[in-house]
Amino acid sequence: MERYENLFAQLNDRREGAFVPFVTLGDPGIEQSLKIIDTLIDAGADALELGVPFSDPLADGPTIQNANLRAFAAGVTPAQCFEMLALIREKHPTIPIGLLMYANLVFNNGIDAFYARCEQVGVDSVLVADVPVEESAPFRQAALRHNIAPIFICPPNADDDLLRQVASYGRGYTYLLSRSGVTGAENRGALPLHHLIEKLKEYHAAPALQGFGISSPEQVSAAVRAGAAGAISGSAIVNIIEKNHASPEQMLAELRSFVSAMKAASRA
């Protein structure tokens, strides 16, 4: 969890927002996936949000569903994902690493065992996408026992009770949704969300990162101007992988260029 605190303190000193890319571990295969993650970091990613391949990702649109299918086609398992995470952590000791999970994957070997494994490989946070705040107690309690930040989603229509719960239970960062629905770069986030960000700050929530539909540098700078601590972009990045995975050098070059531009916008 301390890696998030250190990151946000450093960015604050530099008057920058965070740019956080999302990719699915093992897409389009383990070796390429590790190269992709190195490229994202080299190009300026401040933190990573990583998915573990799952057969029924309810919160995700077609782009990220396809990433899951490519990882499955490559035979990637959750155990291999944890091996990848250990390698990433060894190579990049300071970058915050977050997982975006579904409850079934957490339940598989027991909730406590899952968070213990996260701690062991150097994961900083876990967002369980299909567990609402009011059902989150066993997850967040296990997370905190293992020094893992439980991440909560704050939807655009959140009422005051939900805002207070998210602020109270969340650590690391708060995942602020640009809009309702599923992920996807084609559904552009309706920026900005001043009122929610102000309320979250008032209730001492973990810093807000805006996600869902973030696909252009202009959206990153708008999120930061609205008071968010940064932005998360998934589908736009996974699109680049989808279109170019047969030409790895081209894919890595396009990822580098996209992430560099998105990071530059966080300094605006």
Swiss-Prot record:
Active site: residue positions: E49, D60
Enzyme class: lyase
One cellular component term from this protein's GO annotations in UniProt: cytosol
Pathway assigned in UniProt: Amino-acid biosynthesis; L-tryptophan biosynthesis; L-tryptophan from chorismate: step 5/5
Pfam family of the protein (one): Trp_syntA
Entries under SUPFAM superfamilies matching the protein: Ribulose-phoshate binding barrel
E.C. numbers: 4.2.1.20
Keyword field: Amino-acid biosynthesis, Aromatic amino acid biosynthesis, Lyase, Tryptophan biosynthesis
Stored InterPro entries: Aldolase_TIM (IPR013785), RibuloseP-bd_barrel (IPR011060), Trp_synthase_alpha_AS (IPR018204), Trp_synthase_suA (IPR002028)
Reactions catalysed, as given in the entry: (1S,2R)-1-C-(indol-3-yl)glycerol 3-phosphate + L-serine = D-glyceraldehyde 3-phosphate + L-tryptophan + H2O
GO-annotated molecular function: tryptophan synthase activity
Job of this protein: The alpha subunit is responsible for the aldol cleavage of indoleglycerol phosphate to indole and glyceraldehyde 3-phosphate.
NCBIfam families documented for this protein: trpA
Binding partners and assembly: Tetramer of two alpha and two beta chains.
Similarity remark: Belongs to the TrpA family.
Protein name: Tryptophan synthase alpha chain
